[in-house]
């Protein structure tokens, strides 16, 4: 039952999919944290895997960069493969001065400069929010592990190289915690097709201060976030 962008067989994906942007990061998650791993799709080298974590079946697949790519894969996973829970895991740039590099942000809502949710909502503004049950599961997992998290709005940008740095002042004033490129689209797709979605990201760099994590710090923080998210996923 291959789709135009996924060549997995029926039943290849678990109900819960971790959804990093980078397909090689998906491979890393599968090989590092899952057992009994099987690669289930590789169209356009957008790799997807299914395995088990602490006995529960879990999948992980790359989404690509940006809302259009993420929305394509999310739609096909939900509509054609019966995926119920999509959890974006990745990195972001911090906006707020009280957010630090290596912090973990849970995107309770996603602002955006994209028009995609207006298109699906007949020209009106749609509140792109995370699913409460998924968000609560990750928050509880963070409490158990003692992981410091921030919960609030992220901004899903269409442009990586923004021509309007003054927009950062507006974002900070409005309490936006970090900038990434997918969550608003993912949340819109999930709402449209009756699935559940969440965005969990680590702060790899600070847009206002210029501070950045080293590659070693980035990997350690990312690993901690993945374990926290997987421990939440097995409770769903």
Swiss-Prot record:
PROSITE patterns for this protein: PNP_UDP_1
Keyword vocabulary terms for this entry: Glycosyltransferase, Transferase
Ligand binding (phosphate): 21, 25, 44, 88-91
Domain of life: Bacteria
Keyword rRNA processing: no
Listed GO MF terms: purine-nucleoside phosphorylase activity
Reactions it catalyzes: a purine D-ribonucleoside + phosphate = a purine nucleobase + alpha-D-ribose 1-phosphate; a purine 2'-deoxy-D-ribonucleoside + phosphate = a purine nucleobase + 2-deoxy-alpha-D-ribose 1-phosphate
Active site: 205
EC number from the UniProt entry: 2.4.2.1
Gene3D superfamilies: Nucleoside phosphorylase domain
NCBIfam families: deoD, PRK05819.1, PRK13374.1
Record protein name field: Purine nucleoside phosphorylase DeoD-type 2
């Amino acid at each position: 039952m291959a789709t135009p962008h996924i060549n997995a067989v029926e039943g290849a994906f678990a109900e819960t999919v971790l959804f990093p942007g980078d397909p090689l990061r998906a491979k890393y998650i599968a090989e590092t944290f899952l057992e009994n791993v099987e690669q289930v799709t590789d169209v356009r080298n957008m790799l997807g895997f299914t395995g088990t974590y602490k006995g529960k079946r879990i999948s992980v697949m790359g989404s690509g960069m940006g809302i259009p790519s993420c929305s394509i894969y999310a739609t096909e996973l939900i509509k054609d493969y019966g995926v119920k829970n999509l959890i974006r895991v990745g990195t972001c740039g911090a906006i707020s001065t009280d957010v630090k590099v290596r912090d973990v942000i849970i995107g309770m809502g996603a602002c955006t400069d994209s028009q995609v949710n207006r298109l699906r909502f007949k020209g009106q503004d749609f509140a792109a929010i995370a699913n409460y049950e998924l968000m609560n599961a990750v928050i509880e997992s963070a409490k158990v592990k003692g992981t410091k998290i921030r919960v609030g709005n992220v901004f899903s940008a269409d442009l990586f190289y923004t021509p309007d740095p003054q927009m950062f002042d507006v974002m900070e004033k409005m309490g936006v915690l970090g900038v990434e490129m997918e969550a608003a689209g993912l949340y819109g797709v999930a709402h449209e097709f009756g699935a559940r979605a969440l965005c969990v990201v680590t702060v790899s760099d600070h847009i206002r201060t210029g501070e950045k994590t080293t590659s070693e710090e980035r990997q350690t923080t990312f690993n901690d976030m993945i374990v926290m998210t997987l421990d939440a996923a097995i409770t769903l």
